[in-house]
Amino acid sequence: ILIGLVGSEMCIRDRVKAASEFGGTGTDDALAASAPGYGGLIVPKGEGLRITGTFLDEISHDIPHQNWGEKEWDADFRHMKSIGIDTVIGIRSGYRKFITYPSPYLLKKGCYMPSVDLLDLFLRLAGKYGMKFYFGLYDSGEYWDTGDMSHEVEHNKYVIDEVWNMYGRKYESFGGWYLSGEISRATKGAIGTFHALGKQCKEVSGGLPTFISPWIDGKKAVMASGSKLTKEQAVSVEQHEREWDEIFDGIHDVVDACAFQDGHIDYDELDAFFAVNKRLADKYGMQCWTNAESFDRDMPIKFLPIKFDKLRMKLEAAMRAGYDKAITFEFSHFMSPQSAYLQAGHLFDRYKEYFNIR
């Protein structure tokens, strides 16, 4: 041990000398630079659940567009692949009048013609990079206006058949369905809507998997358009379990996985809610995924890439709970090296450092 200490001291003195010769600020800085973990992580690496899926947020409620073409999307899929992403999910195929593909049905309903067939683009790129693409259903906006989810069944019963015939039969990368309606509590029409849509998706595609991604009605579940970051009335763990026990009971035969959004509860609440989510999923034979939000809900600016430690803590909680898969909302804006947000690329670097990805 003594020899090791002497050797370390000699090494430090050499660094001090080098620092002074090249304009260093002195002994204290050089000693700090030689300390274990300097410039790197001081927490154990790789103890979180790796992100293996991401949403593709091209028809968005509240995230600015990056106006990418095929070249940029191709590069982004390559970045995704480099960290182990094998699943990409179209967040929704349309929102109100904006749509991702030239849908004969939706165009007749007054939707706008898109300049690019993004659905075809995403399916081709998913195939190129060995990924599976999950198709996100159409969102008419009527649920957000009325609070009743049942309106979405009428539109999507045509969209599901149309998309399967136009794309599902053509591309092997078409791997599943995302039932894009978002809820947090027992919601009018939710069980019937999820069941009807999930059943149809499975019937037309020969049983391809389906999933949902609800939010937890925690303290951070506030309107994105408002100025508040938190609210006083938040769901308890017990009430969350009661309501989702009822919902899972009504949908588990046609919904294969549930990826709860993880950003609406505080970091010291993660373990309690995650344990409930996993227990309920196991009870009903569903997969328990986490939707690890890579944007920061704690900031007054909506929305910017998340602080790395916050993402790390959420992924570590998912690992402790025994979750089956981690997906994120979403890579292209908040983790990509080519994002419009400079700090997204830094998050990408910290993520790779934590998981020892070269």
Q: Model-found features: residue ranges?
A:
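Boundary/entry segment of secreted carbohydrate-active catalytic domains
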Residues: 35-94, 230, 236
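Active-site clefts of carbohydrate-active enzymes
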Residues: 52-62, 141, 209-229, 262, ...
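Substrate-binding cleft of secreted/luminal carbohydrate-active enzymes
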Residues: 88, 259-267, 286-358
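Aromatic- and acid-rich polysaccharide-binding/catalytic face
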Residues: 172-185, 214-215, 228-269
